[in-house]
């Protein structure tokens, strides 16, 4: 069974409490459960890791190399600033889908550019919690095409 590693970045542990008008009322646990269910329906395993620390996320990407078939990453604001995370994702040997609950292009200008997008197979943004299911589906399709 292929493994997807789902990574959640800074402040995502506060989902459901922090800015619900932007991020919705669903908690991170709600979104992870939705992703796990979507993965199970597609015959995939899913492992989740959340950290508020850039280095820990980089370590998680490194640990996924050779073990996971794909990454789904919601790096939060690190998506716009972390060249180190960009480099780690670039070194990962499977498809990566970048995920955002909100649509960064419709928000503040500093959110309009993602440093992860150039090393991701695709970006899913603006669909709220549904994005987690869409990201797993995208990864499943990418893995299917790779086999």
Regions found by a protein language model. Give the residues of each.
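Extreme N-terminal starter segment of soluble prokaryotic enzymes
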Residues: 1-4
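Glycine- and acidic-residue-enriched helix-capping/strand-helix junction motifs
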Residues: 15-30
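Short beta->alpha junction loops
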Residues: 45-55
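Short, glycine-/small-residue-rich phosphate/pyrophosphate-handling segment
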Residues: 47-48, 97, 106-147
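Short, electropositive alpha-helical surface patch
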Residues: 56-71
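Short, hinge-like loop/turn segments at secondary-structure boundaries
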Residues: 64-66, 90-91, 113-118
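Mid-chain, well-packed structural core segment of small domains
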Residues: 68-105
């Amino acid at each position: 069974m292929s493994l997807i590693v789902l990574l959640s970045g800074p402040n995502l542990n506060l989902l459901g409490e922090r800015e619900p008008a932007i991020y919705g009322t669903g908690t991170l646990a709600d979104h992870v459960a939705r992703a796990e269910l979507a993965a199970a329906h597609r015959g995939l395993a899913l492992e989740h890791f959340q950290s508020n620390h850039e280095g820990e996320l980089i370590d998680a990407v490194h640990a996924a190399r050779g073990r996971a078939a794909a990454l789904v990453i919601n790096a939060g604001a690190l998506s716009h600033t972390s060249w180190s995370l960009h480099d780690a994702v670039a070194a990962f040997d499977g498809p990566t889908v970048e995920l955002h609950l909100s649509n960064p292009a419709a928000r503040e200008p500093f959110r309009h550019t993602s440093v992860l997008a150039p090393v991701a197979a695709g970006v899913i943004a603006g669909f709220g919690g549904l994005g987690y299911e869409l990201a797993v589906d995208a990864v499943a399709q990418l893995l299917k095409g790779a086999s």
